[in-house]
Amino acid sequence: MAADRDNFLQNIENDSINNGQAMDLSPNRSSSESDSSILMNVNDIKTLRLDVAPEAKSTQSKKSLFYENSDDAEEGEIEERTNKEEGQYHHKGSKQLRFEVGKESTGKLQSHLSDGSATSGEGNVRPWEFRKVIQAEYRERLPRNYELKHWKKPSKIMIGSILRLLETNTVSALDSVFEKYEKEMNQMTHGDNNEVKRIYSKKERLLEIILTKIKKKLRQAKFPSRISERDLDIEYIYSKRQFIQNRYSQELQNNERLEAILSREQNLLEETRKLCMNLKTNNKKRLTEKLIQKDLHPVLNKAMEYTYGLESTNGFMHPDGPVTFRNDSHELNLMLNDPIKSTADVRLDKEEVLSLLPSLKEYTKKSKELKETMGQMISDSHEEEIKEVFVPHHESHQDKTEEDIH
């Protein structure tokens, strides 16, 4: 009976294993994760056996977290995926290039394939693939015409500086998260501080594990060769920030001081300009007064008048009138209340002038008589001169003719 019972259980176990393999190899396997887990539990013969004690949950299926995967396994998966993608694209390219196509079409095809592979590679990047993530971030932040050709693995100093930056933010990140979800934590723990501390310490250990994982991945990643070790050092970043702030404040102070100096110089320039104008006008007035009073040397009078514009070429100053007339009026004490009328304003008839000035009649009469007498005297004198010249000549000519006759 015992042997038959063991054979029966063995047959059931073999049938369940065969059914499981057939389900795994079937192409139309489209059930959900919950259904597959139920089938696995049903098909597992050990769960149905009553003569064997059930195994612990930890030994049955141990759940692996995303940060606990081994680096070698992850790298193997990445290499297998990249090889498969390259094989697929190579196979597609070889199929399309079997036909005779022009060079332009083949170039377009190759560029299209390269663009497609790049986009698919960037789209399928996982967070822990630091090499691809770093390259994608640098290419996204840098301009399109800038190309990074040389990459290198980070040094220990660079990795230490990056981890130092992350470690300084872990405490603040934990505190901010616990402050944000304080009500939920109190509701879940019913105000038990020990439970809250336990959760806090658990999250600290989780962050420590993540940091160790980041450290391992950073060793395998690559950074641009132009980045130096000190660019990611927290002390260098802080000192550089402080230096820039101090320099900026210094430049602001210098700018304010220059603005104050500039405004002061502008005010001084305006004052000097006004002073020069006042001095020029005062010198002009003083020189005119001295020229009027003739306090200067007589040799300098005319030169000063022409040099300082006190007298123009026509003998007149611009606002004050002729200098000579002012000198004469000052010397002769001429005080004229009425303005002098010009000849253009006097419009009188000849009869009115003769009536006002009777002496002009005598003057005109005498001038006429003088003209007549002068003309008569000139004519008489001319006649006498002509007679004196022509009469002796005529007599001499008559004598010569008589001599010739004889």
Curated annotation (Swiss-Prot):
Residue spans of biased composition, Polar residues class: 8-21, 107-122
Biased composition, class Low complexity, residue ranges: 26-37
Main localisation: nucleus
Keywords: Cell cycle, Cell division, Centromere, Chromosome, Coiled coil, Kinetochore, Meiosis, Mitosis, Nucleus, Phosphoprotein
Region (Interaction with NKP1-NKP2): 353-400
Acidic residues bias spans: 69-78
Modified residues (Phosphoserine): 70
Compartmental location: Nucleus; Chromosome, Centromere, Kinetochore
Residues passing through the membrane, by range: none
Region (Disordered): 1-37, 59-122, 379-406
Annotated Basic and acidic residues bias: 79-89, 97-106, 380-406
Keyword Cell cycle: yes
Protein's GO biological process: attachment of spindle microtubules to kinetochore; cell division; meiotic cell cycle
GO cellular component, one term: COMA complex
Origin superkingdom: Eukaryota
Region (CTF19-MCM21 binding motif), start-end ranges: 317-340
Keyword Isomerase part of the UniProt annotation: no
The family this protein is said to belong to: Belongs to the CENP-Q/OKP1 family.
Quaternary structure annotation from Swiss-Prot or TrEMBL: Component of the heterotetrameric kinetochore subcomplex COMA, which consists of AME1, CTF19, MCM21 and OKP1. The COMA subcomplex is part of a larger constitutive centromere-associated network (CCAN) (also known as central kinetochore CTF19 complex in yeast), which is composed of at least AME1, CHL4, CNN1, CTF3, CTF19, IML3, MCM16, MCM21, MCM22, MHF1, MHF2, MIF2, NKP1, NKP2, OKP1 and WIP1. COMA binds the centromeric nucleosome-binding protein MIF2, and to the outer kinetochore MIND subcomplex. OKP1 interacts directly with AME1, with an NKP1-NKP2 dimer, and with CTF19-MCM21.
Other comments on record: Present with 2688 molecules/cell in log phase SD medium.
Name recorded for this polypeptide: Inner kinetochore subunit OKP1
